[in-house]
Amino acid sequence: MLAYNRAVVIELRTRLTKLFASLGLSRSASQLHVYTFSSFAKRVCGDTALSECEMNEWEGVLLDTIKKKPNDVRAAMPDLQYVFIDEFQDITQTRLDAMFGLKKIYNGLTFFTIGDKNQSIYGFEKKESMDPNYYYKQLYETLHPQKMEMYINYRSYPKIPEEANRYLPEDSRPPVICKNDKKNEPKSEYVYIYQDNRDWSKDFGGYVLWLKEQGVTDLAVFFRTNNEVYHGYSLIKALNLPGIRIRIQGASTCELYRMREIFAVLTLLDTECNKKIKLENNQTEYELKEKIAYWMSQRPNWDSFYMDFAFVLILDYLDFALTDEESHTYGDMADSIRKTLKEDNPQLYKLYDDERFQNRRILLDQQLNVVLTTMHKVKGLEFDAVIITPSVTSLPFNPTEDIDESIPLSPKDIEQIEEERRLLYVAYTRAKKYLFVYKGNRERAVENMQRFTSLEDQWGIRERKVGLDNYNIGFNARFKFHGNKAIAYNVRKNDPVIIKRYIGMDKIGRPFTTYNIIHNGSIVGQLSRSSSIDHRMRTNNIELLTGFFVSDVFYWSYQDTLDADKRKEKEFLKNPAKFNFKKPEPFATKWCEDARKQGYVFIVDIAGYGK
């Protein structure tokens, strides 16, 4: 069985083990092997073949092995009979070619795929085509599968999918509402569509009060981009509403295990890596719960949700260990959680709300959870109530270039806008009970298959691309390492920061300019020359920008820098022209001795619109 991330793999394995046990087929369950595509590559190719490759290159090595070394594949998996592919609509060409290659090696191999074309929203990651039909057509023509269809929607009250269906292609068969949802449908209105550029933030406080009265426990507010999430956060924060807990799930700059709060929990497990997990009387659970709860009380600037989220991941591992005959250590648990968090997977948040953990978590107070998130982060999730805000970003979406509305749409542009329609379909269908949609000019452009020029510059200067490259990590690891402890304990997620120009002199008297990130009067980081904010400030001779927020505090290790230096050296040897035939200078040499001894530094990640 092949799934797209480790969290789904774990969920599938757990569900199938329980299913087979209930059918009296526990032994048969041992013949099921559930993998991500990368772990499947590791099983087939082996550690040695992948040791010199980045994880994002593993699938290419897998395809190459299947094509050129079929005997090695058979040796790794001699009895392969069935392949199940989950979420087929998100397949890539490399993965599809690998599956077709397996069919040539194993003559009697049977495939089973499951997916929903209308939920294909990650086409921007694919090189060949964003259109899911491009891949389904190859599947149909190569394997001639029998097609079976499921249409019943078990999540939402009837009017919610009815509104969402407007974004489906004409030849799509819309889902059928299950009888219970029809039976329980409220008589009062529960879907509100505003077509008139109405300001959602002015309605927000009233919605919170009303939804609380309806017994709603979670409200999600959807945005198209990460910067729009933080713009929305600034509007909600200004309302100063009591009795709500705000959680931000924006676009990830790096893997979740790098977040300060989760890093601390994993480090706690690593320091006692050989300690045996004690399941009797929930001893390990209570010990770790007490420790993490103590941190919550003593570290007010840390994100309590993510500490609790890390604890829920511990609970999930302990439940797994309870069903496994092998003994487990704290180190095993840390490694497993770290692997799970390597993938940018929104479905991980489902674990937090899993009924198994609702009374075992640390945070149990009954506040309304308000989740601010990008639309790409909600696939597989569901919420009692959803607010969809209007976007001002470009269409087709291109964060690095401006859109000219006068140019006719190319076939690729059409594919991109069709994916935006699917994205709105997915967003609408996350709502179970209440849906509030605010439409602006961009949403009308999506509906009418038209271009739309970004209006984000009206809000301020933004980072056009999320990523670690926007920050000078060496600055925190050398010149500002003495401030690392302050970042660790004093910088709170969502705190305001400013960007300020600094003009200095180098050792031989030449002037230089940098742009520093300042939190409560102290420098906590520096933008790199890759940052689009840095570029705009230089170009427009801007000294100071306000309007930014701390989106995350994450760690970066000395080993990470050594590994990055090795990758760059390898890249240089392959393609020196990319570096103007000048060997790149290693960044590890720029770490000060104290930073090397500690082994890591904290980096402040920012988002928002600067003015």
Residues covered by each model-derived region:
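P-loop NTPase Walker
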Residues: 1-48, 429
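Core RecA-like ATPase module of SF1/SF2 helicases and allied nucleic-acid translocases
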Residues: 6, 216-418, 434
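Conserved nucleotide-binding/hydrolysis micro-motifs of P-loop NTPases
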Residues: 6-9, 39-41, 117-121, 127-129, ...
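Conserved helicase NTPase motor core
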Residues: 33-130, 152, 379-380, 385
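Conserved RecA-like helicase ATPase core segment
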Residues: 97-183
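Helicase P-loop NTPase motor core
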Residues: 144-146, 152-244, 359
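Accessory/regulatory regions of helicases
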Residues: 399-401, 406-480
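Conserved active-site motif detector
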Residues: 444-611
